């Protein structure tokens, strides 16, 4: 706990030391900021629309806009109101993405003793690694960019091949992935749950076997991107047996947290990897003057909107997620939803976490297995 708080204090100081020499830092007088209280006064919370003018300057070739130099990559995401978003990944922030994924796997192997999981073939179900250039900066989906960050010692066991990964049409790509993996010694499979389910269905359709029978040494499933629980029963039914699952919390804006233990609830917050975290009570996020809390001020069981400041050049940035701490020593959290994912046709304010919990209870009572779902208010 105390190491995490010290790390956060040190990161804020490092961010301010570099940030004050950027256009953003000069616009917000970061040179005069001495502590977190001063930081909150100088740097307002912002969404992508308020960040966009700085991103446009970077696209036009300007240096030292949000962070020193220029980004190594733009991670491209689809925004609901802002259109396509271009999130910078810098030379300083790039290690956050790969090293955190590595740390999650290392924690798993250290706790479980399952070192054999690293000896076989591993598949990362991801977007295309082919990148375009925007403002002369390599640009693509985060999962595609991540393929360029994987070191050679991991590539030896990585599937699918680069050529297959570059296929844009998902159905064609999935068939090719099945071709390449069907007779391999797969020990680890990674991806978002819906993609893994489609892969498992295609494997079973081709082989007539459960995934666990097809890959007898498969024992680790790594997932992230969406809540795992609604998909869990169907995925394990497709596998045909239990395997260990490692949950991760990657985002284009940074690798936020990862499951460091198979025995404890929640994901370990990534407190020493170039991100200074802030938390806003979820009910206040759309107010004009929301309460902003540092890590040492959070409480267990309360819903917070997650705000990040990072060496990617993100400042007071609202990534749109809500989280809830389940432990403060160490700092472990669960993702409870998106700040805009709620239904309130009659002022009921039903959030994503509540919908998912209700679905889990209902599916358990009815013996149902959920593959995918959509929720919306229907007023007759």
Residue ranges of each PLM-predicted region?
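Conserved adenylation A10 loop of the ANL superfamily
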Residues: 74-88
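Active-site glycine/GP-rich loop and adjacent strand/helix microenvironment
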Residues: 1-31, 39-46, 53-61, 145-380
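Conserved AMP-binding loop of ANL adenylate-forming enzymes
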Residues: 108-152
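Conserved structural elements of the adenylate-forming
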Residues: 89-111
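Short, solvent-exposed loop/turn and secondary-structure capping segments
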Residues: 87-89, 134-135, 201
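Conserved beta-strand scaffold positions in the cores of enzyme catalytic domains, especially
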Residues: 86, 122-124, 245
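Short, glycine/acidic-rich hinge or "gate" loops at secondary-structure transitions
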Residues: 28-34, 116-119
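Conserved pre-ATP/AMP-binding loop-to-beta segment of ANL
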Residues: 59-75
């Amino acid at each position: 706990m105390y190491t995490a708080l010290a790390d956060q204090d040190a990161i804020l100081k490092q961010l301010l030391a570099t940030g004050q020499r950027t256009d953003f830092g000069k616009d917000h007088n970061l040179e005069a900021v001495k502590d977190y209280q001063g930081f909150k006064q100088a740097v307002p919370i912002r969404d992508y629309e308020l960040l966009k003018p700085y991103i446009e300057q970077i696209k036009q070739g300007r240096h030292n806009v949000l962070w020193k130099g220029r980004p190594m990559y733009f991670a491209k995401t689809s925004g609901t109101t802002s259109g396509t978003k271009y999130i910078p990944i810098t030379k300083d922030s790039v290690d956050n993405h790969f090293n955190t994924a590595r740390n999650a796997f290392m924690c798993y192997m250290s706790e479980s003793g399952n070192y054999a999981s690293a000896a076989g073939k591993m598949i990362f179900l991801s977007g295309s690694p082919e990148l375009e250039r925007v403002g002369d900066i390599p640009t693509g989906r985060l999962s595609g960019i991540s393929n360029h960050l994987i070191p050679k010692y991991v590539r030896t066991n990585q599937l699918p091949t680069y050529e297959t990964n570059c296929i844009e049409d998902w159905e064609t790509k999935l068939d090719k992935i099945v071709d390449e993996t069907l007779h391999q010694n797969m020990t680890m499979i990674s991806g978002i749950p819906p993609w893994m389910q489609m892969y498992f269905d295609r494997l079973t359709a081709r082989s007539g076997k459960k995934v666990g029978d097809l890959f007898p040494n498969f024992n680790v499933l790594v997932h992230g991107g969406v809540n795992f629980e609604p998909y869990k029963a169907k995925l394990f039914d497709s596998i045909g047996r239990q395997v260990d699952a490692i949950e991760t919390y990657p985002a284009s804006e940074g690798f936020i947290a990862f499951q460091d233990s198979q025995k404890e609830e929640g994901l370990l917050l990534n407190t020493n990897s170039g991100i200074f975290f802030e938390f806003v009570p979820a009910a206040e996020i759309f107010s004009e003057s929301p309460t902003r809390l540092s890590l040492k001020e959070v409480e267990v069981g309360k819903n917070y909107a997650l705000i990040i400041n990072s060496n990617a050049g993100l400042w007071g940035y609202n990534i749109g997620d809500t989280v809830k701490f389940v432990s403060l020593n160490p700092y472990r959290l669960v993702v409870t939803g998106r700040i805009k994912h709620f239904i309130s046709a009659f002022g009921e304010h039903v959030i994503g976490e509540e919908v998912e919990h209700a679905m889990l209870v209902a599916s358990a009572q009815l013996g149902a297995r959920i593959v995918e779902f959509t929720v919306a208010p229907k007023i007759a």
